[in-house]
């Protein structure tokens, strides 16, 4: 039994949102760079090759692999300088990413607090 399985999954999401934040900031920094193409970091959850049986329809499926990919968008709105970065879109994505980061952090802290209470033998 892996007591930290949930925390480790949140750790992956927290690290992902941190890396994505840096990519989005790079887009903002290059908003005026000619021929710059916007980038984004996306992730995939690869399902297991053997389907797992769940006892409830709301159970989360087990995933084998968490994979990140850096995507370069070659299409989209482009100015005369062939740059496709929209400052408004990047700021919007940064805010959404920040909220995701904070949410994953709160979930991870909640899981750790629960484990701490269990270890100490308190059910508060």
Curated annotation (Swiss-Prot):
GO cellular component, one term: bacterial-type flagellum basal body, rod
Keywords: Bacterial flagellum
Domain of life of the source: Bacteria
A GO BP annotation: bacterial-type flagellum-dependent swarming motility
Primary location: other
Location in or out of the cell: Bacterial flagellum basal body
NCBIfam families named in the record: FlgB (TIGR01396)
Family from the record: Belongs to the flagella basal body rod proteins family.
Protein's job: Structural component of flagellum, the bacterial motility apparatus. Part of the rod structure of flagellar basal body.
Subunit structure: The basal body constitutes a major portion of the flagellar organelle and consists of a number of rings mounted on a central rod. In Gram-negative bacteria, at least four rings, L, P, S and M are present, whereas Gram-positive bacteria lack the L and P rings. The rod consists of about 26 subunits of FlgG in the distal portion, and FlgB, FlgC and FlgF build up the proximal portion of the rod with about 6 subunits each.
Protein name: Flagellar basal body rod protein FlgB
Source organism (scientific name): Aquifex aeolicus (strain VF5)
Classification of source organism: Bacteria, Pseudomonadati, Aquificota, Aquificia, Aquificales
């Amino acid at each position: 039994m892996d007591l930290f399985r949930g925390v480790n999954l949140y750790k992956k999401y927290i690290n992902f949102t941190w890396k994505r934040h840096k990519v989005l900031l790079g887009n903002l920094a290059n908003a005026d760079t000619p021929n710059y193409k916007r980038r984004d970091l996306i992730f995939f959850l690869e399902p297991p090759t053997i389907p797992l049986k769940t006892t409830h329809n709301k159970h989360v499926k087990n995933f084998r692999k968490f994979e990140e990919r850096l995507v370069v968008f070659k299409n989209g709105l482009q100015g005369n300088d062939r740059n496709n970065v929209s400052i408004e879109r990047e700021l919007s994505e940064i805010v959404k990413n920040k909220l995701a980061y904070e949410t994953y952090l709160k979930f991870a802290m909640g899981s750790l607090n629960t484990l701490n209470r269990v270890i100490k033998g308190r059910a508060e």
